C-alpha cells in the first residue's frame, strides 16, 4: 500500500474545491475580499446562509481562506496559513487564475481537475505513473485496489486531463502521465510528487517527455529485452528499435 495514504491532507484539500458552488464562493472572496459577510456571499450566489457558511468554513479548515471576526459578523479573506504551505500556493494559483479572463465552463473544468486528486488511491496512481508508463496490473499494485476500482480512479484522472493511454500490440495498453497545461493542474501534480519524493529519496519521477510514437517504440524495446515496459532503468535495448526513437526520446531514456 502506498505511503500516499498516510498523508490525506492534500486530497482532502482538493475535495473541498471539487464543487462548483465552493469554487464560485472562492471566486467571490477573491473579488470582494474582506468586504462581504457570509450572508452577502449567500445572496450574491443564491445560496442558503447556512450552506454558504459551511462551504466557507470547509475552505478555511483546509487553509484556502483566512477569516476575521467583527462582533457577530464573519469576513473571509485570502490571508495565508503559514502552517500549510501547499494550500497557500494552491490558493495563490487559483486566485490568480480567477482574476484573469475565465473561459466559459471554467467551473466544470476546475471540478474535473480537482476530482482527479480527491482520493489517496488516485495520488498513488499519479506517483507510480510519474516514474514511467505502466500497465493496469502495475497500477492496481501501486494503488492497492482491484481492477474495477482502478478503472474507476483512472476515469477521474482521465477526465482531469492528467492520465492517458495508448496501445502496444494486440490487446495491450499502457497508461502514462500527461504533461500538464492548466496552471492549477501543474501545482497539484508538483505537490503530489514533491510529497512522494520527501518520503522516498530514491524516488525519480520522469514525467511524460515522450510522444506517443516514441512510447510505443520504447515499449517494444522493453518487450524485446524480456523486461517490463516500465523498467526505465534498463538501458540495453536493440540497435534497430533504438534508431526509431527521436533524439529527445533517446535522451529521456538515458536520463531516466
Language model features by range: what are they?
Residues 2-10, 27, 31, 80-131, ...:
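Amphipathic alpha-helical dimerization/coiled-coil segments
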